[in-house]
């Protein structure tokens, strides 16, 4: 009989205990008072009410007040908020949306926030009011331990509708020491992605502008726009306002960056940058607009906004499909360099190009067609023969066909042909004339890859030979886009090594290379490449530093070595016949335990014909070391062997971070001009949950030891 009575109680509980959404109560023992309608549950007690789950050892349901009374420890899990509430006493409504909790603690698992309070009052789905509350995003392992920082408040009100938390009579404590009091402060809830408010402050000191304190204010303008304002004044009396506006549009987005300053001499200085992307245009085209303007040449570098010394204003439109690319650009350059003139450099450029790939049905292979036009305009109108006022309009076409096939013994044969055609109109330059030219190319290539695989390792050796023939076209055209030819493994088998259209590589030549690669289980990989160019005659198109001058080029070498994920080495060099180094570039990445490094070394021989009057010998080193789980030290060093000078280009950065706090102290040495350097010290401090998501901004979740 008792068994059937228990079944009846369990069946009737949802009918007269909890109103609203369906409720499920389970317990080891359940006692129902037929006179009062009260229910007492004990043992492992669980109530599930929609997204809320309550667990305790004992509770009483009061039928007259339609409430739940819990006299012992219990917890409530909210699956929507991903939040757990612990308390030692509670009086809750039957739907658990309203009530009073004593000695309570709330843990937001996703945002890692913890709030403890002497008393918590729940007022429906919207408000949760906490008296004598302590809040922190730091993980607290023991009840007696103190977090790195905390906020103690007389009252905390969590508004779940407006997604904000209000602190009344709040004291901010750092390592247990009170450092700040405010009678009222409202901050967004940690799950808010965007909200108006102050961002973390940054303190910067440099030997030119003194102490600067940055306190950005972020202002949302609806769901699709925002503004960030950063006013600051330094110890030298310079007043500055920085502003950034971002706007998402139906057809793209726009970003405006602006800063204006009044220096100690009452001089007004400013810069304005605009970047707009247009993603929805007719016929699937996209576009980009960039505008840059400054009040004077040194404002941005002196105030730490950047060292850009050429301003590029442009409008571009483009479309890319599987076998087609179309692009058109209007570009205007403004130089800030004292060694250049906006009148004599090509300040305005218009270019357009169409690239199309075709697959010929009868002959096979691939056919790439490129049509482009370009116009350069200079402001000068002196009509001199030195090209300082020269304006050029060019139209050109390029057709390239190539096909590969495998012949006997695994030899891969390839054939390619190319036709280039250009027409030039030259203005305001008596030394150059309008002209047209057509240049045909032909190439035959043979390569023989041989692979040997054995016991988890493989060897690949591949000799390559390519014969290229072309005419020697002596038409002289102004060279505007091919001033810096390069010779490396990426263009060894190209028809030419000039980057543009205005110059092309002449004559017959033989390109040779030998590739070797060793791979063992992907954990150890080594390889090298040797290459050389042999010509029938020296056409005197290249300077000595390119490695391409003479009938026989210098030796092109490229090597790489990878050991697991911790060591990587790449080296590229041009060697003369006597093995002296003409150019060398080495990249080395290495990591071991807590240490990681990335370095690059560059050596270029001087070449006055290319405007390089001194040899370049520079070492770049980036290194970082994790002392433990909380501290990291990183540095970036650039050493110029030619000038015998060391600079800290990115400086020295010491960072402390844990589950709730991140702080950075950095030293930077910047080059703001060819003769002046700026030393800068910066400090900023960030607390998890204030203006950012704690789980994304900070480093890790601390695990308590048992």
Task: Annotate each language-model stretch with its function.
Residues 9-10, 38, 67, 155, ...:
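A generic structural signal for solvent-exposed, polar alpha-helical segments
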Residues 20-142:
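Charged (often Lys/Glu-rich) extended helix/loop segments that serve as interaction or gating elements
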Residues 83, 89-102, 106-137, 144-151, ...:
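Outer-membrane beta-barrel proteins and related beta-barrel translocases across Gram-negative bacteria
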Residues 5-15:
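Bacterial N-terminal signal peptides
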Residues 16-17, 470:
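Hydrophobic alpha-helical elements and their junctions with loops/disorder across both membrane
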Residues 10-12, 55, 178, 211:
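Generic detection of intrinsically disordered/low-complexity segments and helix-coil linkers/edges
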